[in-house]
Amino acid sequence: EKKGHKPTFPSFKALQWIYLATLDGRELPADVQAANAYLMPLLKKEIKNQSLYEKALTAIILSKTEPKLAAEYVQSLKEYTVYREDMGRYYDTPRAGYSWFDYKIPTQTVAIEAMQRLTPADTETITEMQRWLLQSKRTQAWDTPINSVNAVYAFLQGSNALAPQALSVLKVDEKPLELPKATAAIGYVKTNVPAESKTLTIEKSSEGTSWGAVYAQFMQPS
């Protein structure tokens, strides 16, 4: 402003600062409160011109003071998504942001966080967003420590994912498999099935996203 430029939206660093202060929740010093009081009204200006990452951060910040407006921002975030059964729900727009080392992970994780805070009952959309995040681990990886932490947070926030849950039931040709105890940490299980078996079925009763892999090994007669 000293140079004659009147900002219409907080800078990227200022936006991240307000976000962190919102999450922390502690009372701020008087001078910092004054700075925040200046920045907060700017969050409601020119939001249509901001990236989806910035819109998601803004929704989280406003969730405590203006939940109705924040919910409108989250609805906008949902309207920008596209859905594929195999990939889940994700952003296919330049407004989602992209870089060679981050891919679109930052936008996806902060959008999930905003949805978890403001529309926790919409588990279908959140789960579909998480599915894309998991699929990106396979194809693009979570290449930085920050992306990895944010991705894990996006899966665990607002859920009891680490609580004991019913195990999935594996069946071969409709007959339940008796499985040995899984190895610690990775949950690896090895068992033998008849060579003439045809169909493997996995039945899951717990909530949330589950993932795993099946490896088949056999001896070829000489």
Question: Where do the PLM segments sit?
Answer:
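Long, domain-scale non-catalytic interaction/scaffolding regions in large secretory-pathway
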Residues: K2-S222
